[in-house]
């Protein structure tokens, strides 16, 4: 039974991402999770502009300046008997593409909700994405050290707006200045809250049982009585936790706490490691691949440039689907049809990188990329598979980009193509002129591109408005028809960063007319990598 150690390693893995609306406290939760995983000694809370103490997971220049997480970091740490891979996703509303792709690489998600605000727009969008793969969701109601909405109302809102059943695991006692702690329904115990302990793991003060007189003495008779009454209601009206429904993405366990006060995060982590699935099978075009298969397979879901300003490098983030990575192993780079020798893959602790000696199904490793790896690429040890479902979206916003110094056109193009390969932005080169058009899903992406062109490629660029409303990738099985379409639509055609033919429409009316005139041509709003 030589593969017992391998199976044990795979079953320990828990790979998840955090989804939330901007400012719901995601970066703070990431910090505290790392603190409990003993990955960092003290939590540096994210401060406003220019503060010197930055959250461990926000490490690019612009993120440090603005206090928002723009790129997906990967952090690995042990917790209980598991090895947890946490993928930190951009919380800012603009970064849906990067976030979306990250959600294709995880087996479960932690949804963080600001308990003062409830379900917000961004959370809805991200939940739609997790629905596509029925990803199991754990919920953390955050910011109980502030005044919050009624907890029952919050559960109702999650159920009705996100269409998922809620099973409360803990229940808050008071909130804001009156916040006293939580009652853990499964353990039948009250965990008391102490203020001012946000940077370290505090000793827990626990009161066993709901009818314990110590509870009244500690939190006050009124709050204790309120807790008992609320629990009677909650237990009568809400769902019990059901593992099977959770794994199907139909029910979410709900925890209450405050990430800033470092309270309740461990209960949520306990739930996540106990209940969330070990690495799941993944669908390839040819067949489903099980995590426990001994042959290595993996796919690239993100490329990031210049993680190390000292080295002009790019790292391709790969989710291992099955098997084991060992240093120096040979694998097939399926799209290019060639064997590669991977000797220097890295593992992550947000911006700190260490060489991976071995990594297993469920883990994320980084491959050094010198321009040959693209998002969606599959690597295998033998079988020629292609993992599916890593999409590119047609951008919704467009601008022309121009140089302050015209002599740097070559660097500009190189920078833009690299940034587009990494998914930071999309680039379109019209066939009829030398313009460069940048397409994004959100406004902030434009700022990121200019900032990164300056700091990483030493290119000063500015934007101008451009008459483009939308873009569609063009496909047609009939070469003659495609040729006719290209001849008649020269002014609206461009090549994207990967040289795919794209139709750039000045208005939606124009796009609809083109579709009517050329019914044989497909105009696609998404394109799989």
Curated annotation (Swiss-Prot):
A GO-annotated cellular component: cytosol
Q: What is this protein called?
A: Peptide chain release factor 3
Q: Does the keyword Translocase apply?
A: no
> What gene codes for this chain?
prfC
Q: Which UniProt keywords apply?
A: Cytoplasm, GTP-binding, Nucleotide-binding, Protein biosynthesis
Q: Which GO terms describe its biological process?
A: regulation of translational termination
| Localization, UniProt | Cytoplasm
Q: Which of this chain's residues are annotated to bind GTP?
A: 20-27, 88-92, 142-145
Highest taxon of the lineage: Bacteria
What family classification does the UniProt entry report for this protein?
Belongs to the TRAFAC class translation factor GTPase superfamily. Classic translation factor GTPase family. PrfC subfamily.
- Phylogenetic placement of the source organism: Bacteria, Pseudomonadati, Pseudomonadota, Gammaproteobacteria, Vibrionales
Please give the function described in this protein's UniProt entry: Increases the formation of ribosomal termination complexes and stimulates activities of RF-1 and RF-2. It binds guanine nucleotides and has strong preference for UGA stop codons. It may interact directly with the ribosome. The stimulation of RF-1 and RF-2 is significantly reduced by GTP and GDP, but not by GMP.
Per its record, what are the GO molecular function terms? GTP binding; GTPase activity; guanosine tetraphosphate binding; translation release factor activity, codon nonspecific; translation release factor activity, codon specific
Residues forming the tr-type G domain are 11-280
Q: Which organism is it from?
A: Vibrio vulnificus (strain YJ016)
**PANTHER family linked to this entry:** PEPTIDE CHAIN RELEASE FACTOR RF3
Xref: InterPro entries: EF-G-like_DII, EFG_III/V, G_TR_CS, P-loop_NTPase, PrfC, RF3_C, RF3_dom_3_sf, RF3_GTP-bd
